Amino acid sequence: IYPALAIREILARRFTFSSGYVGVSGGMEEKIVSREADIAFMGVRAQGMPRTVSKDWLTFPFRNAAGIYDAFRHLKQFKPDLAVTTGGFVAFPVLAAARILGIPAVIHEQNAAMGVTNRIFAGSAAKVLLTYASAAQEDGKKTAKPDLTP
């Protein structure tokens, strides 16, 4: 949440734009982002991929399919020129909907190892920004170390 808000703050110093934040409805994102008066919060249904065999495997595909629909609807209405994500399971429906709608995506990976969602969408992203070189994918075609220090 905070890396995305920091990226937005840095971009806002250089450009004028409207921004929205897509996060899990009722989740931590909604509580934090709702305090920001100039950011539209758009809720989606999403669920992280279960790491062990459990009943969550039954709901996982359906909740994320619903999340793609939610994100598709929000992005179609908001009409962004760019989708910027910072990973996590909520990025999956956003990146999937952005790909369907032809909206370029920039992925920012702030961890030393790239997460599952970022690995899945790195190949189709317009750019992948890394904090650590160790997070680069083997092909290394779409990665760059960002300089986002204010």
Can you name each region flagged by the protein language model?
Residues 1-12:
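Short amphipathic alpha-helix
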Residues 20, 83-84, 106, 129:
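Structural detector of well-ordered beta-strand residues that form the stable sheet scaffold
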